[in-house]
């Protein structure tokens, strides 16, 4: 399996995102249980418009392909795609050097995947501070 995922990760990120979106939507339509749970969860959260339902499937598929790309690409390649504002970098840098505990809340799984790579490639080198990602 490792060799297959390594091979998949060599494909361009944009292609993987598009492919993942197609697979995610296909799974959404072919799995009645997944589709029902998705609709129920969205309705409970106040999203009743049908356009949201298939977007969840597409984005879940996209995220799965992005994760493979992040996990199996060299850190330098991943870091070359990270965009962060100077203000955010300053805030995170200050927190890292403070020695105080930090809790990172990320908007989706992809950010959760990239955050440790980014921290290791930037602030860890400066501070030597270890982090735990849960």
Enumerate the predicted regions with their spans.
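Membrane-proximal helical "anchor" segments flanking the first transmembrane region
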Residues: 1-103, 110-111
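Catalytic core of membrane glycerolipid acyltransferases/transacylases, capturing the structured
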Residues: 64, 98-134
